[in-house]
Amino acid sequence: LDTGIDDTLALLYVLSKRDEINLLGITAVFGNVETRVSARNSLTILDLFDRKDVPVYLGQAAPYGKESYKVKEEVQLIHGKNGLGNVSFPTSNREIKDDGIKFIRDMILAHPGDITIVPTGPLTNIAALYERFPEVLKVEHEIISMGGALTVEGNVTEVAEANYYKDPIGAGIVFSKNISLKMICLDVTQQSHLYPSYINKWNGYKGNLIKSMVEFYINFHKVGYCYLHDPSAVCAILHPEYFTFLNIPLYVTSQGRV
């Protein structure tokens, strides 16, 4: 997770399906916020909703070939400076664990054929996994990635979607591997909307915090709703019947040529 607003909604979706999804852990990555902020945000949401049993690990702090990552001002306009719509949540003081890449590797090896990884940010952690631990490529696991744009315009450039744009080299590494990868792209997620009439049903202390966060997100979009980008990727685990998947070869280029 690069825990911004729609990542938080995706996490809450998972937490609401505890009988159907066994959440083994979260690895943080850069994107909507810096990696360490992402990790702290994830812990904050987990603790608020009584899931202190779920560990959070640090992942990669910068795109492939880069030494650092700085959140752009336009991203802060979407998710707020804290990634949570500038809403003051009770901060978790739980430990952020190190080496999220090894954690993913350990979980794949411990649960062969029964692991689904849902990257809702740049694919840098997954690229690092395959580069550092190539043995996992021989073990069955599934990736459901929120990213990309095929038949619609990107949301950063005319062709680029934000998650893959932030690390095209990392995305390219992942797409070059012979793995089970489902891409939940803007073509799908921009058809999934969250309206004020729905969030107005949320109440109580926790509900009002989340409502305030989502209101920030809706106000940015200026169309009367917000897109459910990352929750759509989680939905693909629980309800694959809602989706039509096309089995096609894809690759990522960072050279400006298609």
Question: Where on the chain are the PLM-derived regions?
Answer:
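Active-site histidine-anchored catalytic micro-motif
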Residues: 1-44, 51-52, 67, 81-82, ...
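Conformational coupling and interaction surfaces
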Residues: 13-23, 162-169, 184-258
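Alpha-helical structural context
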Residues: 48-49, 237
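A residue-level signal for conserved active-site and pocket-lining positions in enzyme catalytic cores
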Residues: 56, 174, 234
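A conserved beta-strand->alpha-helix junction
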Residues: 58-60
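Feature marks short, surface-exposed loop/turn motifs that line or immediately flank catalytic pockets
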Residues: 64
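Large eukaryotic, non-enzymatic subunits of multiprotein complexes that serve as scaffolds/tethers
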Residues: 73-75
